[in-house]
Amino acid sequence: MSALPLSRRAAIAAALVMPAAAAAATEASAQSGSDAASVDLVRRWADEVVRPLKVQFGDLAHPDLVMELHGAGANADGTPRVLTGLPAVVAWFDQVKAQHAAPVSVRIDQMVAQGDTVAVRAENNWTLRGEGDSQQRRAQTIAAFYKVQDGKIAHIWRFTDRVPRTQT
């Protein structure tokens, strides 16, 4: 699997260039039939896996799925955390699910597809589990790129704000 030919700075810049004001909620742009199929697959991933934090998703993900976590979720030294293979990604979802008091709310602001790659700009909202009544609502902006292979998600590059915003 080849790496996405963008530096971290270029990927973040690309995410910032997609203007929020011009994008209606869940706006999707696809140039061909295969683009539309890729967008539909990524939308299903958000609806059926990310929002409910479902950990069984082999029907949507390639067995050799690679997920790169940049920003929040990255290694302590700031380098991307790379999860290789379905078991590693499932284990990560299990870990995330254990930290949240309620399902994650994901608002997709924009999806753009070209060929087998889909770019997504979104916001995650969730409640972290705390001790006692110390649960706090949080929000994070994310940009992600999804590579589709054989009708399944094969590679995810996820760029997430390292410092979430606290909601009241």
Question: Language-model segments: what does each one mean?
Answer:
Residues 59, 63-114:
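A solvent-exposed, acidic/Ser-Thr-rich amphipathic alpha-helical stretch
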Residues 99-102, 126-137:
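Short, cysteine-centered beta-strand-loop-beta hairpins and adjacent loop/turn segments enriched
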Residues 42, 56-57, 65, 85, ...:
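Hydrophobic pocket/interface hotspot
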Residues 2-5, 15-55, 59-63:
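Short, low-complexity N-terminal intrinsically disordered segments enriched in polar/charged residues
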Residues 104-107, 123, 137-143:
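Short, surface-exposed coil-to-beta transition loops
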